[in-house]
Amino acid sequence: MAVDLNYEKDSKERIPYEHYLEVYQNADPKEISSRCDVPYDAEKQEFTVSLMGVSYRISWPEYNVFHIGDDGSVSPIIGWYPLEKKPNAKILVLRYLTEGGAAPSTGKFLTYREIPWGEVYFKQFQGRCLFRLAFGFGGKLDAFREIMERVGAQAISSGDVGYELEFMKGLFVRLILWAGDDELSLIHISEPTRH
């Protein structure tokens, strides 16, 4: 007897997106705002969230996403706005809004392995992040610098080239590279006071 697994090619994005969207739509926006420390405009029914230096308005309960300028208005499409188009970015922010919570940083940075459950998923992280970063930019430090500066990252004195980027409000990531090394790169994440 054959088992129908109902597997679809896009199930790794569509199914989680639909799940977390339903959770988001049934959540209390005021509770989300308080827990995640993200502003919520009850009149407009919109959150304001920052991702990689770009501010976005996110409607509730629809989850329509628009990047906004410094004056708070929807700005023209001039840059890269992953939260508007990329399913993985949409899922990440949905998960943060439905399950996450803001916590002040301890001021220390952790490697991925030091984060709770980091050791369990380290091989996947190593392949998807560390090796790609090192292989893609280990011999192209100028290109790495240009990209990091474009997204608003600040140079730090680590490795041959290092940058610190505020990924989300209060969550900083450090990306560190060594010239010509296609195997060694480091990514450090700021440690919250609670996990």
Model-derived segments and their meaning:
Residues 85-86, 137, 194:
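General structural signal for secondary-structure boundaries
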Residues 187-195:
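Residue-level detector of conserved catalytic or cofactor/ligand-binding positions
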Residues 33-64, 154-179:
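Amphipathic, interaction-prone secondary-structure segments
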Residues 103-111, 168-179, 192:
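Phosphate-binding glycine-rich loops and adjacent basic patches that engage nucleotide phosphates
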Residues 2-45, 98-151:
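Short Lys/Arg-enriched alpha/beta "domain-start" segment
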Residues 59-127:
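Aromatic- and glycine-enriched beta-alpha-beta binding-site module
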Residues 179-187:
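Short glycine/proline-rich, acidic loop/turn segments that cap or connect secondary-structure elements
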Residues 79, 83, 134, 161, ...:
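Short, charged/polar micro-motifs that form catalytic or ligand-binding hotspots
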